[in-house]
């Protein structure tokens, strides 16, 4: 009995090993459009796919970011300026992509553009603080996807949406975690709808990697700004010691983050080039060994764990 079980497990492992390594043919003829290529995951993925011979269409927010990327890549790579919060910018970029891909369609759409601030305790913020993050991370991603979808459908291609472990476990307030939960939900519904057209949708869920999103300096500046704008009543409830401890934790974030971004971009590349891409990719050991298991625990256990490890306001009961 045990021998048969071991044999079945071994056979399954062997089949899975070969299945995940099957690669799509004629990659050099396939176009991939990537948002957020000024820095971080976006610029690294663009360079990675360019080295592989794919035709990369890289969207950057600034001309400086676009120029720096062009200087590090081959003549195959093309850049366009895109602000995902502006409809007219998305329309212009979509027309630009159409002119490049022609009748082939767009093989890959990678929604990578994102921001993390303002974030912090919810009652330190105003409605526009939430809206600012949601406009980029969720609504912008949705509008880009809807605009590019006819091109992706024509190629029977791939949509790769960058979420986060914060799309599974909400550790802090503000628009970031909300937006990533939204990315997960939108991607799930999109995957089921597009399966009828041969289009595959993958979600990337990175742990903590050192990018602009996790920059200690940026997060500390954001936290201080939120503290300064909140009411005296809220500042009294939380207290100066809470703020100091909060900033101290944020200052240590750079050291906690993984500096090797290829752990994420390799997942993106697999989602674009594999014959059998996964539905979800947990990038980073912290994602695989902590945040993913944490997301499957009963809510009361997660709440208890976070209660005992989180900072307490000065006026906490």
From Swiss-Prot:
The record's annotation in InterPro entries points to: NAD(P)-bd_dom_sf, Sc_DH/Rdtase_CS, SDR_fam
Gene Ontology CC annotation, any one = endoplasmic reticulum membrane
Q: Which residues cross the membrane?
A: 289-309
Q: What is its main location?
A: endoplasmic reticulum
Q: What superkingdom does the record give?
A: Eukaryota
Q: What is known of its domains?
A: The C-terminal region plays a crucial role in controlling the activity of RDH16 and its required for endoplasmic reticulum (ER) retention.
What is the recorded function of this protein according to its Swiss-Prot or TrEMBL entry? Oxidoreductase with a preference for NAD. Oxidizes all-trans-retinol, 9-cis-retinol, 11-cis-retinol and 13-cis-retinol to the corresponding aldehydes. Has higher activity towards CRBP-bound retinol than with free retinol. Oxidizes 3-alpha-hydroxysteroids. Oxidizes androstanediol and androsterone to dihydrotestosterone and androstanedione. Can also catalyze the reverse reaction.
Q: What is the protein name given in its UniProt record? A: Retinol dehydrogenase 16
- Organism, per UniProt? Mus musculus
Its lineage reads:
Eukaryota, Metazoa, Chordata, Craniata, Vertebrata
């Amino acid at each position: 009995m045990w021998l048969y079980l071991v044999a079945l497990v071994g056979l399954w492992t062997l089949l899975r090993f070969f299945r995940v390594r099957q690669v799509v043919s004629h990659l050099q003829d396939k176009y991939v459009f990537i948002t957020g290529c000024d820095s971080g995951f976006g610029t690294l993925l663009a360079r990675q796919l360019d080295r592989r011979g794919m035709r990369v269409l890289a969207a950057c927010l600034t001309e400086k970011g676009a120029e720096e990327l062009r200087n590090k890549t081959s003549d195959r790579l093309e850049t366009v300026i895109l602000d995902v919060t502006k409809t007219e910018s998305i329309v212009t970029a979509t027309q630009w992509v159409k002119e490049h891909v022609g009748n082939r369609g767009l093989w890959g759409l990678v929604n990578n553009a994102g921001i993390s601030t303002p974030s912090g305790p919810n009652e330190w913020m105003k409605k526009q603080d939430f809206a600012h993050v949601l406009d980029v991370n969720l609504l912008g991603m949705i509008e880009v996807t809807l605009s590019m979808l006819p091109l992706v459908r024509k190629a029977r291609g791939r949509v790769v949406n960058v979420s986060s472990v914060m799309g599974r476990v909400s550790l802090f307030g503000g628009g970031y975690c909300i937006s990533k939960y939204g990315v997960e939900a939108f991607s799930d519904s999109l995957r089921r709808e597009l399966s009828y057209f041969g289009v595959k949708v993958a979600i990337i869920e990175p742990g903590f990697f050192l990018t602009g999103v996790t920059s200690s300096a940026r997060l500390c500046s954001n936290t201080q700004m939120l503290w300064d704008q909140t009411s005296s009543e809220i500042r009294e409830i939380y207290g100066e010691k809470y703020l100091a401890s909060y900033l101290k934790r944020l200052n240590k974030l750079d050291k906690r983050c993984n500096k090797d971004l290829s752990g994420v971009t390799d997942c993106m590349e697999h989602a674009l080039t594999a014959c059998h891409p996964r539905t979800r990719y947990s990038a980073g050991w912290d994602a695989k060994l902590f945040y993913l298991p944490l997301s499957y625990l009963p809510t009361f256990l997660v709440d208890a764990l976070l209660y005992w490890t989180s900072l307490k306001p000065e006026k906490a009961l």
